[in-house]
A protein has these predicted regions:
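Residues that define the transmembrane beta-barrel architecture of outer-membrane proteins
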Residues: 41, 66-72, 135-141, 159-161, ...
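Residues on the lipid-exposed face of transmembrane beta-strands in outer-membrane beta-barrel proteins
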Residues: 47-51, 74-78, 143-149, 167-171, ...
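Cleavable N-terminal export/targeting peptides
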Residues: 1-39, 253-259
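Predominantly the C-terminal beta-signal and adjacent terminal strand-loop region
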Residues: 86-87, 95-121, 129, 207-259
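Membrane-spanning beta-strand positions in outer-membrane beta-barrel proteins
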Residues: 44, 85, 162-164, 199, ...
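Short glycine/proline- and aromatic-enriched beta-strand/turn motifs that initiate or cap beta-hairpins
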Residues: 29-77, 174-176
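Gram-negative (and chloroplast) outer-membrane scaffold detector with strong preference
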Residues: 31-32, 80-181, 252
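Extracellular loop and loop/strand-boundary signature of outer-membrane beta-barrel proteins
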Residues: 57-62, 127-134, 182-190, 228-236
């Protein structure tokens, strides 16, 4: 999994570098139309919902099964032209993560003091990793820049479709409670941790009407600071989210969009 994290981090860095190259062209193609406005300027708001997967000491792809998470939120932004838009968003979600195969095979235990042990501890409550899951609640608050790649080409600049790469930066809160898999009993209560989250999404959207836009997205967010799952950090250095979902946007009535 560490190799996967390094690979994904490298890809994110390459994507950000590519966007830094493309960004000046987005302003260059912002051709001024009627009354100084571009053909696709304006404010918009929307809702989004997705399925996040967490990768930390524990993982959504655990030894027992794949745990499906959920997340939902609101966003609002401004579209400057057919290429470039920026938005703010707020989202809440929950996930369950469980031990990976390697930790189960090594028979790791979690003590009630929050320390990893390689066997049960006499005189202290302890639990096998194989019997535990981490229930993570999270909030994400931040900003995103969208670069519509189709807008770079004259033939597709005014298409109903868009294909966007979207670097983002978030303030992320996580709170992880450790529970048993068998009966969902809470064995350790977590505290709230703050993280800086950064990454990028790939989005595909379609303008249904002059007001409504439907889209899908998939992206990665790497988290700084403490592990999101509340487990002791050992061997696994991963701490990132992979989320895919749908978006429904509404162009506000005082904006200027082409028919």
């Amino acid at each position: 999994m560490n190799d996967m994290a390094n690979y994904l981090t490298t890809k994110i860095r390459l994507l950000v570098a590519m966007l830094a190259f493309i960004l000046p062209f987005s302003f260059a193609k912002a051709e001024v139309k009627e009354d100084g406005k571009t053909i696709s300027q304006g404010w918009y708001v929307g809702i989004e919902g997705g399925m996040p997967f967490g990768f930390s000491t524990f993982s959504s792809f655990g030894h027992d099964k794949t745990h499906l998470g959920w997340a939902a939120g609101l966003y609002g932004g401004y579209r400057f032209n057919s290429i470039f838009s920026a938005e703010l968003s707020a989202k809440y979600g929950e996930m369950n993560l469980s031990a990976q195969d390697c930790c189960v095979e090594r028979n790791y235990w979690l003590g009630s003091d929050g320390v990893l042990y390689k066997a049960g501890v006499l005189g202290m409550d302890s639990w096998e990793y194989a019997n535990l899951k981490s229930h993570v609640r999270m909030g994400q608050y931040g900003a995103r820049v969208n670069i519509n790649l189709l807008g770079l080409f004259h033939q597709t600049a005014n298409s109903r479709w868009d294909l966007a790469v979207s670097p983002h930066i978030y303030a992320v809160t996580t709170k992880a409670d450790i529970r048993t898999i068998a009966d969902d009993a809470k064995v350790m209560k977590g505290s709230t941790n703050w993280h800086l989250g950064y990454g990028a999404d790939l989005q595909v959207g379609y303008q249904l009407t002059s007001c409504l836009k439907l889209g899908i997205y998939s992206g990665l967010t790497r988290l700084t600071g403490e592990h999101m799952d509340g487990m002791p950090e050992y061997q696994h250095k991963n701490n990132f989210l992979w989320e895919s979902g749908i978006r429904l946007g509404i162009n506000l009535p005082f904006t200027n969009h082409h028919p």
